Structure formats: C-alpha cells, structure tokens
C-alpha cells in the first residue's frame, strides 16, 4: 500500500468505526437501586433443642412444626413454643433421608429431602403418612403462597410446583442489582413476599416471587451471641411466620435458642 493509499484509508477506517459505535450503542438501562438493608429487635427468646439440626420450621395452631436433618437422625417434630418441648416426633420413614424444608397446605405437612428427590407428606394433626411427591434436583427450602409450592435448591432459582400434583410449573432467578443471589436456603411466605435465608450468612432476602428481584435484606448479625460455643455448621437456618399474630421466629442448626424478632429500619451510620 502506498503512502497516499494509507492517508485515504485512515479516514475510511475511522468512519467505519464510528458507524459501528453508532449501531451498537443504544439507550442505557437504568441500574437497579441497591435493596435496603434492615435490622431487627429481639422481642422474645425461647428454648430450642441444641441437638436439632433444624432445616425447616413453620408455625401453625399454636405450635412449631420442625424438620430436622442429618441422614439417620432426620425427624418431623411438633414443638411447644414457650418451652421448646417436643410433644410429637416422627422418625419412621426418614431413616435413609436427609430431611430439609417444610411447608403446610390444607391440613398436610410437606417435608423435603436433600438428595432423595422426594417430598414426604403427612397429616398435620396425627403425623400419619399421606404419600410422597417426586421432584428433580436437590431440595433445600419449601413454602406455599396459597396458590403453589415454592422450592429452593441451593442455587439462585425459586421453583414453583402445582399444589395438587407437585408438578413443576415454572421458576424465577433471584437477583440483587442484576446479579444472581445463590445459596437460597429455607423459605417462608410473608405478606406477599418470599423470605429466604442465604446459607452460611446472617442475612434474609425479601424477594418478589413474580420478578425474583430482592426487595430488601434483613441483617441478623449478632443474634446468636452471648458466649455460646457453636459448631461451624450451627448457622442461621430457618424462618417461621405466625400470620394471625404477625410474629416472626428465627433459629439455626443446633442453636439452643429460638428468637421472636421484629424487623426495623437500620440505623444510619
């Protein structure tokens, strides 16, 4: 190429590049605002079985119903809130399972298993077995929004299942500021939102089930303090909501305490 050709070629290259920029550049999408972080106030403290590897918890009819894990030790329990006393316990049928999340629907309890790919169904009043439902992948957390079951599997997904057949009918990815939120664990449906404990953290994500967007965070740091020596796996793990009483309960694996808390705006620093 001659010097003259190079001189004429350079403006052509610049024009071509400017055209490419003009074509590829478009209107910028507005960035999502950071989800607000809230704090908490302890309202009441109740005793909790420190040997319970708690994986699921719900509040119904004045009692706590608890799913505990560890293969060979898994159980389903009915517990007195005020004393922590286990008044009913079932282990039969769970010998080979690692029990996980727990939900109630129309007088029946649905207990997930971690890797067995089956949900066990019981009568709420008697704990008598009422069947099973199969699902793919792992089971971590479970709740119900009066229309469908909502399941977490440790990823950034919430999966939706039909209430009658337990057939998967959809899913949504959970994001905060456009980034996936992984390790979604135990779930609770609270006033139109899915609240999810994020595994091995002290935070609860408040999630829109329609969009998957994190609406807010609850920071429970320092909740289990007071000199207790806990196992490395003794992490915050479950949420239970008393809808009629508007009370919120949280505890963890192997925790000796269960807390009733009130969510409050975080103090500005």
Residue ranges of predicted features:
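A short helix->beta-strand "capping" segment at the edge of beta-propeller domains
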Residues: 33-51, 81-88
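Beta-strand-rich domains and repeat architectures in extracellular enzymes and scaffolds
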Residues: 43-75, 91-103, 252-254
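Surface loop/turn motifs at the tips and blade-to-blade linkers of beta-strand repeat domains
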Residues: 45-50, 90-95, 131-136, 173-179, ...
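Signature of short aromatic-glycine-proline-rich micro-motifs recurring in repeat-based ectodomains
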Residues: 54, 184, 231-241
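Short coil/turn segments that connect the beta-strands within blades of beta-propeller domains
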Residues: 61-62, 106-107, 146-147, 191-192, ...
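Conserved beta-strand positions in repeat-built beta-propeller and related beta-rich domains
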Residues: 66-71, 109-116, 151-155, 196-200, ...
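Short loop/turn segments that connect beta-strands within beta-propeller blades
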Residues: 80-84, 123-127, 163-166, 208-212, ...
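Blade-loop segments of beta-propeller domains
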Residues: 84-121, 128-139
């Amino acid at each position: 190429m001659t010097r003259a050709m190079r001189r004429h070629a350079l403006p052509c290259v610049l024009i071509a590049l400017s055209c490419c920029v003009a074509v590829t550049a478009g209107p910028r999408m507005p960035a999502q605002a950071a989800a607000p972080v809230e704090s908490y106030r302890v309202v009441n403290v109740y005793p909790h079985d420190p040997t319970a590897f708690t994986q699921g918890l719900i509040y119904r009819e004045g009692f706590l119903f608890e799913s505990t894990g560890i293969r060979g030790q898994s159980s389903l329990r009915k517990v007195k809130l005020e004393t922590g006393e286990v008044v009913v316990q079932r282990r039969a049928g769970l010998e080979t399972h690692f029990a996980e999340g727990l939900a109630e629907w129309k007088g029946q309890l649905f207990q997930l298993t971690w890797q067995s790919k089956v949900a066990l169904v019981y009568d709420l009043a008697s704990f008598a077995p009422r069947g099973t439902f199969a699902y793919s992948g792992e089971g971590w957390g479970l709740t119900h929004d009066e229309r469908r079951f909502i399941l977490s599997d440790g990823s950034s997904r919430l999966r939706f299942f039909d209430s009658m057949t337990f057939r998967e009918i959809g899913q949504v990815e959970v994001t905060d500021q456009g980034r996936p939120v992984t390790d979604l664990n135990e779930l609770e449906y609270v006033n139109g939102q899915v609240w999810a404990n994020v595994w091995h953290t002290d935070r609860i994500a408040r999630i829109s089930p329609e969009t998957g967007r994190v609406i807010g965070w609850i920071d429970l740091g320092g909740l289990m303090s007071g000199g207790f020596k806990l196992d490395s796996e003794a992490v915050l793990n479950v949420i239970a909501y008393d809808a009629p009483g508007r009370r919120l309960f949280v505890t963890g694996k192997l925790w000796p305490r269960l807390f009733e808390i009130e969510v409050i705006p975080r103090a500005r620093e």
